[in-house]
C-alpha cells in the first residue's frame, strides 16, 4: 500500500488490512498491519476506526480501541473487533491511530486507509423472546421486532398495555415510536444471543442495557397484559 508518510515523531505506514463481511450492529473482526514510521516510540496509542458515509461524514466516529506499542521501524500486526454501524447499507470504513484526549494521527497529516463496505442486515434467526404466557401481541409485533434486529439491535423492547394499573409499568405506556434514549430496562424483550434478561420489572423478565450492545425501545411494538 503506497502512500505519503509525514516527517516527524509520530508517523504510520499502513501495509494492509482485512475485514470480515460486517453485519449491522454486530461484532466482527478485522486485521490491520502497519509500521511505526516515525522517530518516537509508541506508548499509549490505540488503533481504532471510523464509519463514514459516502461523503466522508462521520456516522460512528469513536470505534472500539485497541492499544498498540511499537518502537521506531517496528511492524504491528493486530486483530481488531469492529462493530458494524446501524442501519445496514453502504459505508466507508477508515482506520486510524489515536492518542486519547489529544489527537488522531490523521490530524498530524498521516494517511488514513478507507475502504468501501456493504454492511449486511443483522442475522436475527437466533432471537429469543421473553414473554409471560398471558401476553397478547399486536399483529405486527413480530414483524417490528425482526425489523429492529435486522437493523442491527441486539436487544429490542416495546410498550405494554396493562389491564390493571401497575406503577412500575407506567413508563411503558403505548405512545410514541422508537426511543434510543429510553431510560428504563426493556421489559419482555427480544434478545440476540448471548444476551439474557438481567433484571425483573413488576415480576416480568427485563434487560437493562449493559456494555456496548446496541438496543432500541419502540413503543409501536406493543403487547397487552
Language-model features, listed with the residues they occupy:
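A recurrent flexible, glycine/aromatic-enriched loop bordering the glycosyltransferase active site
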Residues: 174-194, 198-205, 211-225
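Beta-sandwich strand segments
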Residues: 101-112
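Short beta-strand and strand-turn-strand segments in soluble, beta-rich domains
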Residues: 11-14, 46-66, 109
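Low-complexity, acidic Ser/Thr/Pro/Gly-rich terminal tails and inter-domain linkers that flank the onset
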Residues: 2-24, 114
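Asparagine-centered strand-capping/turn motif at beta-strand->loop junctions
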Residues: 34-38
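Short, surface-exposed loop/turn segments at beta-strand-coil junctions that are enriched for proline
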Residues: 83-89
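Short beta-strand-to-loop acidic/aromatic patch adjacent to the donor-nucleotide binding site
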Residues: 126-136
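Conserved donor NDP-sugar-binding/catalytic core segment of glycosyltransferases
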Residues: 140-171
